[in-house]
Swiss-Prot record:
EC numbers: 3.4.21.-, 3.4.22.45
Alphabetic keyword roster: Host cell junction, Host-virus interaction, Hydrolase, Inhibition of host innate immune response by virus, Protease, Serine protease, Suppressor of RNA silencing, Transport, Viral immunoevasion, Viral movement protein
Annotated source species: Plum pox potyvirus (strain D)
Name of the protein in question: P3N-PIPO polyprotein
Span of domain Peptidase S30: 165-308
Boundaries of every Peptidase C6 domain copy: 645-767
Amino acid sequence: MSTIVFGSFTCHLDAAIHQDNADRLAKAWTRPENRQVSNVHLLCRRAAKSLINTYESATASAWKGLEEKLQPMFAKREFSKTVTKRKGLRCFKESSEKFIEKKLRKQYQEERERFQFVNGPDAIVNQISVDKCEASVWVPFPHIIEKPSFATPSMKKKVVFTKVRMSEASLQLFMRRVAANAKANGQKVEIIGRKRVVGNYTTKSRLTYFRTHVRHLDGSKPRYDLVLDEATKKILQLFANTSRFHHVHKKGEVTPGMSGFVVNPINLSDPMQVYDTDLFIVRGKHNSILVDSRCKVSKKQSNEIIHYSDPGKQFSDGFTNSFMQCKLRETDHQSTSDLDVKECGDVAALVCQAIIPCGKITCLQCAQKYSYMSQQEIRDRFSTVIEQHEKTAMDNYPQFSHVLAFLKRYRELMRVENQNYEAFKDITHMIGEDRKEAPFSHLQQINELIIKGGMMSAQDYIEASDHLRELARYQKNRTENIRSGSIKAFRNKISSKAHVNMQLMCDNQLDTNGNFVWGQREYHAKRFFRNYFDVIDVSEGYRRHIVRENPRGIRKLAIGNLVISTNLAALRKQLLGEECIHFEVSKECTSRRGENFVYQCCCVTHEDGTPLESEIISPTKNHLVVGNTGDSKYVDLPTAKGGAMFIAKAGYCYINIFLAMLININEDEAKSFTKTVRDTLVPKLGTWPSMMDLATACHFLAVLYPETRNAELPRILVDHEAKIFHVVDSFGSLSTGMHVLKANTINQLISFASDTLDSNMKTYLVGGSEVDKCDEFKNVKLLIRSIYKPQIMEQVLKEEPYLLLMSVLSPGVLMALFNSGSLEKATQYWITRSHTLAAITSMLSALAAKVSLASTLNAQMSVIDEHAAVLCDSVFDGTKPYASYMMAVKTLERMKARTESDHTLNDLGFSVLRQATPHLVEKKLSPGIGASLERVKLVGKILCNLGIAAVAKTYTKTFHPKRRRRFRRQVRHLRSVITWQPVQTPERRSPTEKRRCGLLYTPVDGEAILQSHRNFHKFSSKHS
């Protein structure tokens, strides 16, 4: 294919002009007869024309879309005119709509005239004649008479100022006089150059300086603080020369408050960053270097510079401006200046610190901290500060009576608070948590609003008035008590929705089989099983556990149904229980608060009002069954050794409620929970407590452990005949026909503890048991046994540290405890865990030291009795999760009361018989200490003999025969030192003693003797 280029256009010839065809055409062209214009030229012209048309069409199509898009702009630009802006920029200026309309109307008129002319009838001109006689005459445009102007001529006369022309000397003299006048009258001076510079004369340290206004005085931190041209600089230097410009400044004389001062840089002793050597305009200091205001600094340096501005003056100016704007405009007298200005400033500062205490008035953190404080925090923190400022103003500024009156009122307003918390508590207790209906809701709201005291807002006052109005309306409308509803209309159906126990649904507390994992709770639950449950001996059968006796009757368990038969008929008989006496729904089944039923504290009924009677409850093995009125949930009991089965002791069935609460207890609180139940609640509940006492105990636990409020209860059966509640455990119930209590959670059971609840069931008994009383003598014996047994002592220190206080019953026990180092070890253990226990053990150590100084037993007991009151006050501190705590408190209180009584008797001249009895107690306890010490000495002797035997066996073989006798003497002396007993020589011993002690003197048969000592050591350890 051939290509021909026309200018910038490239033409590709088609196949007709191939190279072969071109050669053939060229040969033909060389012939003379074919020298005319060939077809090749025509083809080239056609191809070129085609390319040009293609280019033009492509160009037109390329610009067509843009032209259509910009057509509105072109149409608008048609009526725009070009203008020239600054720097020769020419642009279009849009015309107004009025101008465009006028232009379009003119174009329309012209087009219309042209159209009428073109389309009008033809006019034929036959001839054109010219009158040559008449010459063309110029006719002037007719004169238009101008109307007279009636405008008033301006009377303003243009003033033309004559230019002031001065010589250099006259100008200098003029500026000096201006400077002298400004200096004398304190006027500002403005120097107008490229930029305006304002200055004035000011006094600092009895010296007059010329001061310019720099930009950082306005609060900004620019890079250039002041810009001066050369002419302004000369004038500024002339004004500075009229002040103490040439004063020599020592190091440190340029201080804050001198921003903008014009000084001589030659007379400055401080290191400085100068702009030139003619002037130095103070800006501030950066890294101990003075900075000139004209010097350019970076943005970082401008923030780091310590500017020498005068904040006090700015504060004074701001205070003055605001005071003048806010002062009273209308007064009944003429205001005069009677008080001292400085004292006014002092009092203003006192008032400022009283209202808004702060470290610095410019500190943003102080302002934010104060703004975030509540009214209670402000009152608690600053009430004493306000009182101090009031006292200062009263002592130093008594003439400011109005300020004293303001501070007094402000302090009284700050202290307006309702401190009658006792009445608030009583009202809340009398109303209770469940009374949400009127008028109790209004009373509760008024009680909550009044307790706020001075913190009540205007909205609170409005709400209190509204509630009081409702109470007045209620009291007005109530003319008689609401008639109580009939028992026949009482309905208390089971809820259709099952209670959701989130503790049993949490994946983190379930194992792979979906069973509840007790974790650390399993270990601490043993306190319940060890004290309140019996282990079922399967070999004896289940029959002995079927009948459960109570103070008012019996109930049969379904534990015998654990033995099941393969005979279906016999198995169906196990589904039949033993029917109890049938009771209809009566007042005994209901609980009321006021005139309303408290349904969770009532028995469950059917839809027709008949009571829901319990059916046979099948037993399970090692399960805790929770869920009272809903579907029961089976939780595996903590695992026991050998898969033993536990059953609550007679009267202990209510412990299952506390065991169910343990499910909701956090693992780290399980120890304190179980100890609180064991040591605090169960001793108070005693045997067969009432439901009211049990509910109160549950409320006590719910306060300490709020997560137990939604713990599910085991099924509780109501026996109205025996007036007793039965808490059903995993062994079910064979007795049927009892009523069922509706309460399903601990929070619902707590309602029985309210005094406002009218219910006969509050006095019903619940299963319980009596814990063995703490025996002081047994505990003292345990303490004596642990003195010389480190393992037992360690267990005592960790689990029952208050048992150490029982040593005050005997001086011998106290000193033995001190000499063994147990008190010191207890102090070291508890010093980082409980400061109270560490202080108690330290007091016992100090008491033991004082007791050791007394010579007689009565004197030792007197020392202990004198310190019993101090120990009692230190020990008694609320409730502690230790069994020995209450025992120690009671012991110390008894000793304290006995000592006070004995002092009274001694003062009256009576003798006390007790002085003859301490030796009897000491005689009873001292053998235990001696026996323990003898066992320790015996073990020590055995270990000593074993050590000496090992030494003798090892080293006598290596000695020379002549030196063995000397070695025997050395070993004999070592034994006498260790065992504190003199050892006889072998020559003076009997044959039996020689055989017994032969190990000490001869290495013969040492292995046999060692074996005999090992056997004796085992015997001693067993019997000690």
